[in-house]
Amino acid sequence: PLATGFGSFNFDEHEGIPHVWTLSEPYGARDWWPCKDDPSDKADSLDIVIILPSPQIAVSNGKLKEQIDMPGGKIKYHWSERYPISTYLVSITTYPYIKWVDEYIGLNGDALPLEYYVYPDHYNQVYENYSKTKEMIEVFAEKFGEYPFMGEKYGHVEFGRGGGMEHQTISSMGGYSEWLIAHELGHQWWGNLVTCESFHHIWLNEGFARFSEAIWEEHIGGQNAYINYWNNHTYYGSGTIYVEEPNTTSQIFNGNLSYNKGGWVLHMLRGVMGDDAFFSTLKSYGSNDSLAYASASTEDFKLVCESQSGLNLENFFQQWIYGEYYPKYALSWDISENQELIISIQQTQAWQYFEMPIDIKIISAGQTSVLTVENDGPVQDYNLGHVDFVPDNILLDPNNWILKEVEYLSLDNMNASEFKITMHPAYPNPFNSKTTIEYFIPDINDATKPIINIYDINGNFVDKISTLGNRNEGNALTWDATGKASGTYILNLLTP
């Protein structure tokens, strides 16, 4: 059976006092209340009635409809949730909390109560950061659209687990850092307003919440802080953001893929689309008639992005969500005999090629210029035309909009030994009769007639291909294997 979650319904203690709390994501709601436990099938409303001894306080989703003293020193709490809600976002927490309130004034002047329920012994340490929540809502409302549950509340309630959980309208908190607060608040839009339709697409929750942290970082620290945030949340390893088998919490809540790389996808989309189109897309995604207060897949989000930007993003989503790894760029440049600046960009990775716009920054005599080139193959040259200067430096993606590695191969700043002759994987592979082989020979090598020898798996010579090399650019040639036996072949690139 599926692992249901992180404990579901918990009878706990804090400072020796009984403490009940729930955490149902991903599949734990079924453990403690009868429900159709599917994130795409939201309940249209919910009432939760809790009777418990005083001075315990019961906290749950939505608005407190009534609080009634009962015989025997007990209290009845009736919470009412009237926005659609996924089962895993339903929450009960009880403890004799200290409570304080604040207020957020919405974009149209409506007031939203902010309620904070904290352990008495934690009050002093959490108060300052919790009180920043109002400003965070203001920032997110401006970027994402209005807080989605204005008719009810937002707040925090402490519970007995580390980290946090974005229960609808009331985040359960096991910490109090600004970034945890921003993360769980961001989920109110991305996870609660629009919920991933299945946990295959959990990045639509967690990657977006990670991105929300970066937006708060940008607000308090500016552009450099935003860039540094992403530098500190990189992931270069294997695995796809799309969760192939969402059966366990470790598969679903992969911090590197669902969170960090998922957040990077949004950061890169921002770079590809530009701020106006990107944030317009987020607002449209959160207000879409079919997705708001409902659920979405990666394809749904892609369609909104394409509609708002006018871009074809099929390759972007295929390579970053369903593909693995990242591009490894090698940049070289030269001044031609005609005084033209030629920039060459290789993708040197052994896996998929990435199609991305790349910013190039040219620095000369204290002056800088930035241009954007479209890059989608193993080797591409860009002729920038006649120049009357020699660049002091040329930088690829200087503002770090792409998850990548960069190697600089320019003759002016690299040793000749660091130039790489590269042969890329043949494609298609497997193939029927013909396959294409691409290679790159930097112009520092005097090889004008490279040869590719082809051997079978036993090392027997099978065929030879040769062609003229072109200075500072990649070459592609086709091997026609008609009549050759099926099997595995080895390619050997030689430069005379």
Where are these regions (language model features)?
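Hydrophobic helix-coil surface modules that form long, contiguous segments used
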Residues: T22-P26, C35-A182, F211
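Exposed aromatic-hydrophobic patches
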Residues: W79, V379-V387, G474-A481
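Acidic/His/Gly-enriched intrinsically disordered linker/tail segments
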Residues: I202, E206-V272, S290-A292
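Zinc-dependent metallopeptidase catalytic helix centered on the HExxH motif
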Residues: S171-I227
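Glycine/proline-rich low-complexity spacer/linker segments in large multi-domain proteins
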Residues: P1-D47, N400-S417
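Amphipathic alpha-helical substructures
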Residues: G255-I343
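C-terminal outer-membrane/trafficking sorting elements
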Residues: S417-Y427, F431-P496
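Beta-strand-rich binding/interaction modules
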Residues: Y329, W333-L395, T448-I454
